[in-house]
Amino acid sequence: MLSSWQKKFFQTPEHPPAEGIAPPRDDGVPNPEPVTYPDTKYPSDVVNHDAGEMLPNEEAQDGVTQAEAITLTWSKISLGAAYFLMWLLYLVNGFQASITGNLSAYVTSGFESHSLIPVISIVSSVMSAATYMPLAKVLNLWDRSIGFIIMVAFATLGLILSATCHDIGTYCAAQVFYSIGFAGIIFSVDVITADTSTLRDRGLAYAFTSSPYIITAFGGPAAAEHFYDSNWRWAYGCFSIVLPVVALPMFCLLRWNRHKAKKSGLLKDKADSGRTWMESIRHYIIEFDILGVFFLAAGLVLFLLPFSIAGSTEDDWKSASIITMLVIGFVCLLVFALVERFVAPVPFLPWALLASRTVLGACMLDVCYQIAYYCWFNYYTSYLQVVYGTSITTAGYITSIFDVVSGVWLFIVGFLIKKTNRFRWLLFIAVPLYILGVGLMIYFRKPSWSVGYMIMCQIFIAFAGGTMIICQQVAVLAASDHDHAASSLAFLNVFGTMGSAVGSSISGAIWTHTLPGALQRLLPDSVKADWQTIYDSLEEQLSYERGTLIRQAIALAYASTQSKMLIAGTAIMALSLVWMFVIRDIKLTKTQTKGVLF
């Protein structure tokens, strides 16, 4: 039965190549024949490139051909400028994520919708997940710069809408545009990083581009408190100005070097397709699998949202609207599966990638990691402020420990990958350490413990989480060639983002089904009737002085709720102990890219 399932969904099984062929030279002298390495067993490890070839691969997809032409054309100065601009883009993303992340609880509380944080996260995550594969196709079929600038437009629109919204509905819509845009920008930058680096140095390249998070971890929370004291709308408004200013030079750099490549003859004009406008529209609807994207996004949103909002409805799970959403969501997911299997000429996901156990293992590891993380993270800043009495700035610093520690640690991880030409051994350390960090948070979550123990757990999580993220990216890229690099990264991001949506759904379900009951049980009789007001607003919760019976009751209710979230996250993360063994121990000596590289 398993073999028949594989034949249906996967193209061909992996067959070992011939062995005994000499490894490629690294001195620029071409090898006369394709090469494999003594310890490789699978086709993904076969090197079919001529090491001395200085022409872009005309048989690759247009976006890949253009990327190779650019790296063969540009100078070291252009390479340095590209990495500096990508570093700036990560800096902008880090600042806006840190600032708006610390303000989101107050923005939603201002609309009396604090409990809707997971709902917004679920919708944003699902829509982002549905965007990755179409974006990868834009990057592959058209141009890296085109996909990048489209995502900049989405992010800018989301920021403008967030700055001008006056109700929770508009804010939710703004967050969807904003999340799609910034997720797409970072994905585009990661693909460009893969285009412009060797496989051995890719870990270091990703460490460099993501290093701005070290800076934003300190500046973001303090800026968030300043915006909260003055006007939170400018937290979004200022970035709607800054983002285009930083992004346009990157777009211009790519377009200019593309122009140089065409002028030098490395890049040829694309032949006219001969399609009419209507034929082109139909072609791209099929190519981007718009039908599949619609059913996937609708199915996930409708199926996951009830878990977060059922507890806040009058009839709970008996509510007709909740039952309807679950049924329609399940039907949409079923239709998505049937459409992908029997109807779609170009499926939403390149399922054949899962024939590689490395891609499968990395994707499932990322799913477990994201679910486990978002099981407890969405309400973590609120938890720190209520239970430990931290300010917005201090809570932001604690949640930013991951960015600081992992930002520095990733350089060491990248160096270790470069020196050993291996990455899997790092997972054997990182996965157990992550489980330990989350597990210890269960024990230290109570108000009676010092916040220092929570900081210790965050440091463990930062070391482990940063290592897992970089190893997952290197794994899927090592298991594919340059032509499929964007698709492989998109595949990983789709799984990870859907995992974050599931984690947010679990978090919301625990919150709405645990915290109200805990408040009604623990609050003094004098304020029991006000439990709904307290539940809906973080500002209301913080208005009670620390040490009072009311504040202590709220803190204990938070601790009880956080405990269930952490237990769920730890249990799910334990599955990663299996997935890390599924990933193959690939030696990172393949030649994938050409030209002037990182």
UniProtKB/Swiss-Prot annotation:
- Which key words tag this protein in UniProt? Cell membrane, Glycoprotein, Ion transport, Iron, Iron transport, Membrane, Translocase, Transmembrane, Transmembrane helix, Transport
Q: Which residues are glycosylated?
A: 102
For the null mutant, the annotation states: Impairs FsC-mediated iron uptake.
User: Where mainly found?
Assistant: membrane
One GO term under biological process is: cellular response to iron ion starvation
Expression induction or repression? Expression is repressed by iron.
Name it: MFS siderochrome iron transporter D
Species name for this entry? Aspergillus fumigatus (strain ATCC MYA-4609 / CBS 101355 / FGSC A1100 / Af293) (Neosartorya fumigata)
Gene field: mirD
